[in-house]
Structure formats: structure tokens, C-alpha cells
Amino acid sequence: NTISHLPEGLLSSLNELRSITLSRNNFSAFPSGGPSQFTNVDSINLEHNQIDKIPYGIFSRAKHLTKLNIKENQLTSLPLDVGTWVNMVELNLGTNQLSKLPEDIQCLQNLEVLVLSNNLLRRIPTSIGSLRKLRVLDLEENRLEQLPNEIGFLHELQRLVVQSNQLTCLPRAIGHLSNLIYLSIGENNLAYL
């Protein structure tokens, strides 16, 4: 499609709306209508648009939001209130232009899937170790030179993808990931494990 905006107040008027998919369109910004448009929504898919920012407070009323897919957009940063998205279970921010992941990511205690592939990340904050329910962490194709030791606290982690980065070594703490099923480490600068 080539939709670039929705009629003012459309989403807010749909009181029973639970899931929104507006992928593969021409949105350059979030739909206008403020936080009330997402009050009862549990899943939002805005994949493959041209959105360059997530407005501060846009999910302040989205108490049921558990899945956000904003892959393949133009995001350069996350909003300062990202730490308030406490019910988020799946967060896909792949293929954007993110260069930094805020420390507040640690507040997303229910997060199980975090996709950050194809961004510009040079480091992952140590607070990542607080995401104790995380099962999937996809960091493929970034600019990471190292992973924090705190990654070893992710005892539920089953899938770790760090392929196509600039890693020279892996933290020994990876040995603590007893539930790890899949580890992808190709195309790095590793000399040993």
C-alpha cells in the first residue's frame, strides 16, 4: 500500500481494536491521535515504513501492549519513556538506525524477544542482564565489539544471534546460558572461544 496517514481520530474511535497492522506503507510518523488510540491494543505492526521516531508518551495508555514490530523504519533513537513499556513481551526494532540502547531497557521485565539486528549499535548496556525472561536476543549485523558479562544472567535465553559484528571475544559468562539452543557467532573478528 501507499498509505501515509490515517484520518484524524480513526484509531481512537475503534474501542474494541486489539491488533493494528499498518506494515508496508509510507508512514513517516506514528498515526496522529495520541496515546488514547492504543488504549486496548495488544499488538502493533508498523514494519517497513519510514517512521523516524516513536513519540514520547505514545504508549502511556497502552497497558495491554505486549508486541511491537517497528522493523525496517528510520529510527535513530528510542523515546525517553521506553522504560515504561513494562508489559512488552516482543519488541522488534530490527533494520533501523539505532546507535544506542538506553539503560532503561532493564525495566522491560516481561520481555521475551528482543530483535535489534541491522542497526548501528556499538555496545549493549550492562542492564541487559536484568531481562530475566528473555528467550531470544538478536543482535546480528551491528557494530558490536564486545558483549557485556551480564549477558550471563539471561538464564532463559535460548537463541543468541551476534553474527556479523566486530566481536573479538565472547564473555565467559555465555557458559552460564544453560538453556541456549542456538548460538550464531559467524562473521566477527573472533580468534578463539
Could you say what each language-model-derived stretch is?
Residues N1, N25, N49, I70-N73, ...:
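Consensus "Asn ladder" position of solenoid repeat domains
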Residues T2-K53, I58-K63, K67-N69, T76-S77, ...:
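A generic tandem-repeat structural signature
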Residues L6-G9, F30-G33, I54-G57, L78-L80, ...:
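The feature encodes a structural signal of leucine-rich repeats
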Residues S12-L17, S36-V41, S60-L65, G83-M88, ...:
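Leucine-rich repeat
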Residues L17-L22, V41-L46, L65-I70, L91-L93, ...:
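Conserved hydrophobic beta-strand positions in leucine-rich repeat
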Residues L93, Q97, E103, V113-L120, ...:
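Compact recognition or signaling/catalytic modules
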Residues E156, Q163-L193:
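Ankyrin-repeat and related helical/solenoid repeat scaffolds used for protein-protein interactions
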